[in-house]
């Protein structure tokens, strides 16, 4: 959360710094080109009509088109700045800073009280839910008993088998279940 707030502050500071740099550079360009200009939200830009009329006699068509493109970009930037300002004004972080009991009091009173629905269980609904639970329990018990009857027991070995370790082979090779006799 602290990182998010810090990042937002850095972005705002950089945006203000860029706006100041742009406005100072555009004001200097306005003094070079004598023409009408507009100043809106501390951002300077020339209108397309004024720039086209003043530059038609002085500059080539390429320079005029570049200025028109720049003015359109400035308009787009202004629109983005306005949207950002609206968003920052609409989204207030005061709710994060208010105590919890004040937030709950404000949220409780939002709905009209006469239309409130009271969900209190009746005796009939309680008895039906108890019956359903008992049926489920009985079904589970029957299922468990059925499994115990139907699952066959694993057959036990008639003769116990001797475990063989293959890591330490014996001198005599023997089968674990067969009787071995030595012949010398």
Swiss-Prot record:
Chain positions covered by the region annotation Disordered: 49-68
Primary site of residence: secreted
Reported tissue expression: Mammary gland-specific. Secreted in milk.
InterPro entries: Alpha-s2_casein (IPR011175)
Phosphoserine PTM sites in chain numbering: 23-25, 37
Keywords tagged on the record: Milk protein, Phosphoprotein, Secreted, Signal
Disulfide bond annotation, renumbered to this chain: none
Keyword presence, RNA-binding: no
Residues spanning the signal sequence: 1-15
UniProt similarity note: Belongs to the alpha-casein family.
Protein name as annotated: Alpha-S2-casein-like A
Primary gene name: Csn1s2a
């Amino acid at each position: 959360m602290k990182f998010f707030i810090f990042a937002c502050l850095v972005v705002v500071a950089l945006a203000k710094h860029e706006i100041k740099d742009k406005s100072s550079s555009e004001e200097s360009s306005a003094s070079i080109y004598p023409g009408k200009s507009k100043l809106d939200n501390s951002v300077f830009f020339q209108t397309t009509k004024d720039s086209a009329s003043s530059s038609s006699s002085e500059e080539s068509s390429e320079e005029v088109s570049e200025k028109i493109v720049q003015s359109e970009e400035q308009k787009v930037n202004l629109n983005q700045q306005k949207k950002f300002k609206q968003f920052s004004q609409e989204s207030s972080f005061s709710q994060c800073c208010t105590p919890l009991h004040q937030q709950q009091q404000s949220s409780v009173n939002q709905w009209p009280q006469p239309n409130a629905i009271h969900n209190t269980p009746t005796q009939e609904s309680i008895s039906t839910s108890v019956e359903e639970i008992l049926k489920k329990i009985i079904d589970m018990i029957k299922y468990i008993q059925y499994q115990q009857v139907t699952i066959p027991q694993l057959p036990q070995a008639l003769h116990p088998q001797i475990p063989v370790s293959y890591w330490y082979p014996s001198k005599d090779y023997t089968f674990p279940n067969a009787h071995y006799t030595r012949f010398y």
